[in-house]
Regions:
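Acidic/His/Gly-enriched intrinsically disordered linker/tail segments
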Residues: 181, 270-285, 292-296, 315-448
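Beta/coil-rich, acidic/histidine-enriched accessory regions frequently appended to metallopeptidases
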Residues: 417-493, 509-515
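Concave beta-strand-loop units of leucine-rich repeat
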Residues: 467-477, 486-504, 510-548, 557-569, ...
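Pro/Ala/Gly-rich low-complexity, hydrophilic intrinsically disordered segments
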Residues: 66-110, 124-187, 438-467
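Juxtacatalytic substrate-recognition/specificity segment
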Residues: 184-315, 319-321, 332, 423-427, ...
Length: 588
């Protein structure tokens, strides 16, 4: 019986292998569809054979391409056969087939990348990223490794790590900038970064590793800024690394925020920041914090890479296009680690929520022809600086998240010209081949969100801020938000949200701002609203809630502002709320 079982298993795996006979066309969608189909066939075989864990791994393996988000990959380490020695014969057969499917996908991705790099309508940035994606599928893929200029270690013939381990040394003299005493701080050197910190050597190493990863992700995100089609073609042909400046970038990491603020006390509003890049010192300056500081670290490191890659003199963006200087740095704040890959961009990016809220509530911001004309001083002295920064972030996302390679390329090329100080006020229109009126229309359209966006985007559980009001989202899409337990700010104004749809937000107990203007909520949602005890602002305008809401709302002791205009809450109900919650401001 056992022999028959193994024979049947072997036949199942072989039958799955035969379906690989027809090579997919060298098109990314075709490759993905073929890969998905083969993985599902393999997963079904695993189900049949009782290999539950292997079926799960197989089904969850493929990365998902979603609208507006770019996939990024760090070069993996080749580990060989990672199966435990005691793995059963069936599991070993699964592993062989699983690895073979990934090798085929890697081969297809590499061929497509080479084609894209040299085609008449070349897309070198996508080609560069696909070479990295190929290594995710097959870390030992020689064609992709060679195309990226990777080298083998002379000692054991293994592929060299993309970033050697950082080295640590104690400060042997007083630090020339911070005044840290000899032996009271550490220097950490990695391939691209030189870090000094008074926290610990381990903290410096941890930061160095994050910044080395970021360096690799930054290159994939802004390929047109630092390289070109010709250099990529030549690199693929000659199997050599693409040219980069051989420099280390300086970073200071302070033990506490207070030390950071004291060191930068001459900078305006420095107490409001979580990181700073100093042009004058050519140094990024950070303090030790939790995971919420990482987007700022990436933001400031991006400024540093843009500024120092070619030794650009100070004064970038002084005459025009300052929006892109800040917009590109804010774009990388959307980087997310998904384990075997990263993403950047997408409708859910934190920096897109406020501009979406403003635009869909009638404040369209500046026409792009006016935005591109603003220089650094004009922006930083403007009374509307926050709105301009917000629009700058959204406009950068509009370019870098665009479905058209021409628009994505235009973003990187515009950055290159800005930092070469060759840009003009007309550069954006020229590079995209669109009029400013067409760009305005495209920008506004890019801020919309649909049910499909919500239902196909992974990682929603991480969201902290979300503006969906007056988008095309319905109850169908809202069902995807049951995982959003980290939300602090949620805006649903004008959506067809009834009591049943609102129940999807039962896990959002950390909310401090909630906007429900114009929704279809009734008093039935009161028990749920009463659980949001951290709320400081609540908008119930133009809903069907009545004075029955008063007892439940009175439990929200942290509430500072309540909007009830157009609701069924009467003047008497308002007075009861004011009596229950001291200092509550009610907009009616």
């Amino acid at each position: 019986v056992k022999l028959l079982f193994y024979f049947a298993a072997a036949m199942l795996f072989l039958s799955a292998a035969r379906l690989w006979a027809a090579d997919p066309s060298e098109d990314l969608n075709s490759l993905d569809r073929h890969f998905a189909r083969e993985l599902e066939i393999l997963a079904i075989r695993c189900d049949t054979l009782g290999l539950t864990e292997q079926a799960k791994i197989t089904r969850e393996w493929q990365t998902r391409r979603t609208k507006g988000r770019t996939l990024l990959f760090l070069p993996p380490v080749v580990r060989g056969n990672d199966l435990p020695k005691e793995a059963s014969d069936l599991v070993q057969k699964w592993h062989v087939k699983f690895h073979a499917l990934r090798q085929e996908q890697a081969s297809g991705l590499t061929k497509l990348a080479v084609s894209l790099a040299s085609a008449k309508e070349a897309d070198p940035a996508t080609a560069y990223r696909l070479l990295h994606e190929a290594l995710r599928e097959d870390p030992d893929n020689r064609a992709a490794r060679n195309a990226l200029g990777h080298r083998r270690n002379a000692t054991d013939n293994a592929w060299e790590a993309y970033s050697p381990p950082p080295t640590i040394s104690a400060g042997k003299t007083p630090h020339p900038k911070t005044g840290w005493q000899q032996g009271k701080y550490w220097r950490v050197d990695s391939k691209h970064w030189r870090i000094a910190t008074n926290q610990s050597g381990a903290a410096g190493v941890e930061l160095a590793k994050k910044l080395e990863d970021f360096h690799w992700l930054w290159k994939q995100t802004f390929f047109e800024f630092w390289s070109s089609r010709a250099e990529l073609e030549q690199g693929i042909t000659n199997q050599r690394p693409l040219p980069e400046p051989g420099i280390q970038l300086n970073v200071l990491l302070f033990r506490t925020r207070d030390e950071y603020v004291k060191y930068l006390s001459s900078q305006p509003n420095i107490g409001l920041t979580q990181g700073f890049y100093s042009d004058a010192q050519q140094t990024s300056i950070f303090f030790v914090g939790d995971e919420t500081v990482q987007p700022t670290w990436f933001h400031e490191a991006a400024h540093q890479l843009f500024q120092q890659w070619r030794g650009t003199p100070q004064g970038v963006g002084e005459k025009q296009n300052f929006w892109m200087v800040e917009g590109a740095a804010m774009h990388v704040e959307s980087l997310q680690n998904h384990g075997s890959h990263w993403t950047v961009g997408g409708w859910q990016a934190d920096r897109l929520q406020i501009p979406r809220y403003r635009v869909l509530n009638g404040d369209k911001g500046l026409p792009l022809q006016q935005l591109v004309a603003l220089g650094r001083d004009q922006v930083q002295s403007s009374a509307d600086i926050r709105k301009i920064y917000s629009q700058s972030a959204a406009t950068a996302h509009f370019l870098f998240d665009h479905e058209s390679p021409m628009y994505r390329s235009a973003g990187g090329t515009l950055l290159r010209e800005i930092y070469r100080q060759n840009d003009q006020r007309t550069s954006l229109a020229q590079l995209t081949g669109a009029s400013f009126e067409e760009l305005d229309a495209g920008y506004l359209k890019s801020l919309q969100v649909t049910d499909d966006d919500l239902l196909t985007t992974p990682g929603l559980a991480r969201l902290r801020n979300l503006a969906l009001g007056r988008t095309q989202v319905t109850a169908k899409g809202l069902a995807a938000l049951t995982v959003c337990s980290e939300l602090r700010w949620l805006e649903l104004s004008g959506l067809p949200v009834d009591d049943a749809a609102f129940a999807n937000f039962k896990n959002c107990t950390k909310l401090d701002q909630l906007f429900l203007d114009g929704t279809q909520l009734t008093d039935k949602s009161l028990p749920l609203i009463a659980t949001f005890t951290n709320l400081e602002e609540l908008d119930l305008s133009n809903t069907k809630l009545t004075d029955e809401a008063v007892p439940a709302l009175s439990k929200l002791r942290k509430l500072k502002t309540l909007h009830v205009t157009g609701s069924g809450i009467t003047a008497a109900g308002v007075q009861k709320l004011k009596a229950a919650i001291l200092k509550l401001e009610i907009q009616n």
